[in-house]
Amino acid sequence: MTNTRKTHPLIKIINHSFVDLPTPSNISAWWNFGSLLGLCLVIQILTGLFLAMHYTSDTMTAFSSVTHICRDVNYGWLIRYMHANGASMFFICLFLHVGRGLYYGSYIYFETWNIGIILLFAVMATAFMGYVLPWGQMSFWGATVITNLLSAIPYIGTTLVEWIWGGFSVDKATLTRFFAFHFILPFIITALVVIHLLFLHETGSNNPSGLISNSDKIPFHPYYTIKDILGVLLLILTLMTLVLFSPDLLGDPDNYTPANPLNTPPHIKPEWYFLFAYAILRSIPNKLGGVLALIFSILILMIFPLLHLSKQRSMMFRPLSQCVFWILVADLFTLTWIGGQPVEHPFIIIGQLASILYFIIILLILPAVSMIENKLLKW
């Protein structure tokens, strides 16, 4: 008698994706982040669902409904802070996942890669709209500043912004629609994740060496299910340490002040995971130029397969490219730091230099270094 897991129409799909999936025998802990992102998504959807049961998306009651969740709902504080800090863990895993893809040349699977970038945009949009919902000062002014960027679009900009706002400023209509979109987007993300996995399983996983590993595959279960559990435990440990010991570490104190359209906070800044893009946006004095730089700072990931000029896929055996890669990482840390600083000397010039360096490394230095390495290896 054949095994149900191999014959049942539904269970068969799960079996081929998570149990009998042929996996390279040498993938490192850097390949854990896919499953960790899946876990983050599940945590966010579940905590978000319970928060939505108590939250009201009205300008008069939104702030007090979040207060009510934290004070009066059973374990409401836990659910709220797990959701807020879960977003931070989500982005940490996302950045590491993308970084792994860049380092080991996973972008060669360009369908999987491009869907991954669409996923990144979708998660960023969801996080932005979620940040508006508590209706604190930074929620309100963050929404005002970021949506206002669309007014830089020639001809239709102003109309577009008012259409998104549902009025002449960020108000009740804006909050209600942001809540609706914030609720629906995670399910769209889940559908995209399925497509992401579908494309990945067409080709199989990459591995640290960047070489074809068809001759040496092992089943996903039990080897990588056990290996992933370590990552899961570390993720939950980090998240719960953050939630239980310093839940407001990554938040902004201004968001504990209810939204007031008449009082602008001294420093408007987004959550930490958007600071690198915010620094790039601010480094260009022109509004439209800044918006374009902001979009291209993420979209540039899509052209990585075209910029790959090396004869080797992975950076594992390319020390020069490794150096450039880690300079890029340091540059992103610099941009993140600058994004949280006020717009004054010397932060302005540091931000501008870091922004220019970001684009130069990706568009010029990495491809050039790849060519040099090819020459050194007489390829």
Swiss-Prot record:
Free-text function comment from the UniProt entry: Component of the ubiquinol-cytochrome c reductase complex (complex III or cytochrome b-c1 complex) that is part of the mitochondrial respiratory chain. The b-c1 complex mediates electron transfer from ubiquinol to cytochrome c. Contributes to the generation of a proton gradient across the mitochondrial membrane that is then used for ATP synthesis.
Pfam families xrefs: Cytochrom_B_C, Cytochrome_B
Keyword annotations of the record: Electron transport, Heme, Iron, Membrane, Metal-binding, Mitochondrion, Mitochondrion inner membrane, Respiratory chain, Transmembrane, Transmembrane helix, Transport, Ubiquinone
Binding residues for heme b b566: H97, H196
Residues that bind a ubiquinone: H201
Similarity comment text for this entry: Belongs to the cytochrome b family.
Residues the entry annotates as binding heme b b562: H83, H182
Cellular location(s): Mitochondrion inner membrane
Matches recorded under PANTHER family: CYTOCHROME B
Transmembrane domains' residue ranges: 33-53, 77-98, 113-133, 178-198, 226-246, 288-308, 320-340, 347-367
Any one GO molecular function term: ubiquinol-cytochrome-c reductase activity
General remark: Heme 1 (or BL or b562) is low-potential and absorbs at about 562 nm, and heme 2 (or BH or b566) is high-potential and absorbs at about 566 nm.
InterPro entries xref list: Cyt_b/b6_C, Cyt_b/b6_C_sf, Cyt_b/b6_N, Cytb/b6-like_sf, Cytochrome_b, Cytochrome_b_C_euk/bac, Cytochrome_b_N_euk/bac, Di-haem_cyt_TM
Main location as per UniProt: mitochondrion
Cofactor annotation remark: Binds 2 heme b groups non-covalently.
Cofactor(s) named in the record: heme b
GO biological process: mitochondrial electron transport, ubiquinol to cytochrome c
Membrane topology, record value: Multi-pass membrane protein
The protein's name in its UniProt record: Cytochrome b
Assembly and oligomerization: The cytochrome bc1 complex contains 11 subunits: 3 respiratory subunits (MT-CYB, CYC1 and UQCRFS1), 2 core proteins (UQCRC1 and UQCRC2) and 6 low-molecular weight proteins (UQCRH/QCR6, UQCRB/QCR7, UQCRQ/QCR8, UQCR10/QCR9, UQCR11/QCR10 and a cleavage product of UQCRFS1). This cytochrome bc1 complex then forms a dimer.
GO cellular component: mitochondrial inner membrane; respiratory chain complex III
